[in-house]
Amino acid sequence: RSLVSLAQEHDLQLSVFHNRRWDADFLTLQQLLHSGELGEVYHLESHFDRFRPEVRDRWREQAVPGSGLWYDLGAHLLDQTLQLFGQPETLWLDLAQQRPGAKTDDFFHAVLQYGARRVILHASTQVAAPGARFTVHGSLGSYRKQGLDVQEEQLKSGTSPLDAQFGCDPRPGLLTTVTAQGPREQSIANLTGNYRAFYLQMVEAIQRGTPVPVKPDEVVGVMELIELGLRSAREGRRLPVGAQHLDSVVQQAPSSSPAHTAPLAMPLGQSGSTPRSTPRH
């Protein structure tokens, strides 16, 4: 909040690299929800599971402020959820240190409540055979997507963001809907991931004064939920989410914490084109 105030005071542009908004699988999920094909969404699970059984010598795995899996990946999964559904009513978080020698959390499981809807955010470092990245169940069907976004690995391997294949995830999702003739499965091709979009929008914001790609108030909202989650884990209970409650949490949070857009209403009208799909018989 101090940074936001400072940026406003000096008429500067401030944003945060929430790059997971431009993951191929998340862009595809957003468009699928907007299409209304799943109907009223009752259950969404967002997993970021990997197999990293050994603790590495790097700051994010040490007992220092801001370390741990909840800060590392929870921030992205929370931001994606807020982009889809807005602020939840309640939040419950479970944290664990599962690996031998772990100094901070390497497992989290969060439950966000939106009325009857439940959103599960989960990440672990001990999953050799990962399940789905996204699982969604609605009144008209279900959707399941395997595999993590490819852009990070492409960048590590030296692939240029200007390459035609950059951001292309060849693993389609599976949409299952129920018709009068029974279940119908469709293979849903992914939209193209595009981390460059953040930087292009940031350039426009600096040069032309257009909105930044990730608004400061959205960043503050994610941080408030991170802090609320840590309190939930410490107290072992579900906590309500609200402006007054979140203000209290942020004010009470120590300066060095120990290691450890608009809401999308469902159902939705049409908004943009539906991801390409191929029926499966």
What residue ranges belong to the model's regions?
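Short catalytic-loop micro-motif centered on adjacent basic/acidic residues
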Residues: L14-H18, I120-H122
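Contiguous beta-strand/loop segments that form the cofactor/metal-binding neighborhood of enzyme cores
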Residues: D79-D163, S187-V212, E227-G229, G242-H281
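A short glycine-threonine-serine/GTX helix/turn-capping micro-motif
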Residues: P65-Y71, R184-G193
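Short arginine-rich
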Residues: L225-E235
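Predominantly a Rossmann-like dinucleotide-binding segment in NAD(P)-dependent oxidoreductases
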Residues: L12-Q13, R20-G101, G236
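Rossmann-fold NAD(P)-binding glycine/threonine-rich loop
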Residues: R1-Q13
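Aromatic/hydrophobic pocket-lining residues that form π-stacking "cages" and hydrophobic walls in ligand
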Residues: R1-L3, L29, L228-G229
